[in-house]
């Protein structure tokens, strides 16, 4: 199914694939609306040539498409279920400057404990790992699919 969103003043069309929940599609849309101002070249589901494909990504590109010095990816967003192994790999080997995990109504203390055990402090320092936990009723709150900016009352943001 195809969904039309108006996100941060841009029309964004997202496909809900077979087996994909609407919640997953919505988290991609909300994550995009939250971070496109900070990362203007933010893309949704762009293949990047790694073993993993991001739900949201902002490449660190200079002129002519060549990578700039530093992290290969300014921003990488994962929505819904993600393994601790994947999170740790992305932060340690993936060239990710900032990794955001988007969830809906997840048990935050349990997830924070798992993340802190799976990812060494040096790989998550300086705000590199971020958890965004949306309210359980976020689908109702965003039903119009017109989101200029995501209200702070819709989520909790935690640096891990």
What is each of the regions a protein language model found here?
Residues 2-48:
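Acidic-basic catalytic patches of nuclease active cores, encompassing PD-(D/E)XK
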Residues 74-75, 95-103, 126-129:
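Hydrophobic beta-strand segments of well-ordered beta-sheets in folded domains
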Residues 78-81, 102-106:
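Structural motif
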Residues 86-93, 114-115:
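A short acidic, amphipathic alpha-helical/loop segment
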Residues 108-160:
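Domain-level recognition of nuclease-like catalytic cores that cleave nucleotide substrates
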């Amino acid at each position: 199914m195809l969904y039309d969103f108006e996100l941060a003043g841009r029309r964004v069309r997202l496909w809900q694939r077979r087996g994909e929940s609407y919640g997953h599609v919505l988290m991609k849309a909300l994550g995009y609306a939250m971070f496109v101002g900070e990362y203007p070249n933010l893309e949704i589901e762009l293949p990047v040539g790694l073993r993993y494909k991001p739900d949201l990504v902002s490449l660190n590109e200079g002129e002519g498409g060549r990578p700039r010095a530093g992290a290969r990816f300014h921003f990488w967003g994962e929505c819904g279920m993600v393994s601790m192994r994947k999170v740790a790999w992305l932060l340690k080997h993936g060239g990710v400057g900032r990794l955001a995990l988007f969830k809906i109504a997840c048990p935050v203390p349990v997830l924070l404990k798992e993340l802190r055990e799976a990812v060494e402090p040096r790989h998550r320092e300086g705000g590199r790992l971020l958890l965004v936990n949306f309210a359980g009723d976020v689908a109702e709150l965003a039903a119009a699919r017109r989101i200029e900016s995501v209200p702070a009352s819709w989520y909790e943001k935690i640096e891990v």
